[in-house]
Amino acid sequence: FSNKGYIVAYSDNYAEVPQEVISVYKQVNTPELQEKCRKLSWMRSCESMMGLIYAIAPLKIVYRMYRKRDGFRVSYEEFMDILNELAEKDGMCIVKGDKLIWKAVLQDNLYERIEEFQGERDFYIPTVDEILDYAKHGYPSQDVSYRKLSSFLRDELHLEEEKTEELLYIVYKEFSMDGMLSDIMEEFNKRDIVFDSDRQMERFAPIMMEVNNNTRMLDFRGYTPNEINRVSEQKTTPVAPAMQSFVPMGNLPTNNIVNMQPKKKIYPNDPCPCGSCLLYTSDAAD
């Protein structure tokens, strides 16, 4: 904002907002504007969630998601007005027909292949807390398995908070987009993150298996492999493998690894749709 005159920065790192700016802001900061900003902000959170767990979804599904939060049970017409206004300000998604599509999957009509993989599965509808969490972090920071991984990265590998957050997002991105453990280990290697002992590797493997099985995936329209397996067991009908491929890496104990046939990864390595992870420059450059 400083280059537009909204903030004045001084050489001693002190900054202040000019009185003229404060005066104008007080004039335009009406209850109506605040309400509009609330609705646009919540819509952006819902779009972020849609991109993270579906990539493409019917507008009616996103509408259901939007209305779950108290105070946002708007009509479908108002929902579309908010969505279209956000599209003018922030082009994260586009409306095509009766569907909302994350822009990252428009290239080469990738969204069509994603829909083909998803098949006729139902859409998982996230809770309000999940939507807010994913929109803020780009991954499920409150999930038990991800918290275990966070503790491991912090306590065992002695990583700082910013680096831990970066890696947790990368882990979610890879697993949710059909990636494998080898993809994640490659990202670790790029950042010169190494394991000090076999004991660390032995602890790491089951944590990653648990994280994988509790990750909401595009192929499953937001459901986790564990949830898909539970439904399959209830129906007693065989389904496609509900867990991603784990490739033994070095001294990883293979008895702790889910051993599935690998699938070709079809999803792009695009930045997190919530935008909060763009500070991770190496990831945003993918």
Residue ranges and their predicted role:
Residues 268-278:
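Short Cys/His-rich zinc-binding micro-motifs
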Residues 20-44, 109-126:
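Short, amphipathic alpha-helical interaction segments positioned at domain boundaries
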Residues 57-66:
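Short acidic, hydrophobic short linear motifs in intrinsically disordered regions
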Residues 2-6, 71-97, 204-207:
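Charge-enriched amphipathic alpha-helical scaffolds
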Residues 280-285:
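Conserved small/polar residues in nucleotide/adenosyl-binding loops
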Residues 121-253:
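Extended alpha-helical interaction scaffolds used for oligomerization/partner binding
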Residues 3-30, 96-107:
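Accessory beta->alpha helical hairpin/"wing" motif in late/C-terminal subdomains of nucleic-acid enzymes
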Residues 39-56:
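Positively charged, polyanion-binding regions of nucleic-acid-associated proteins
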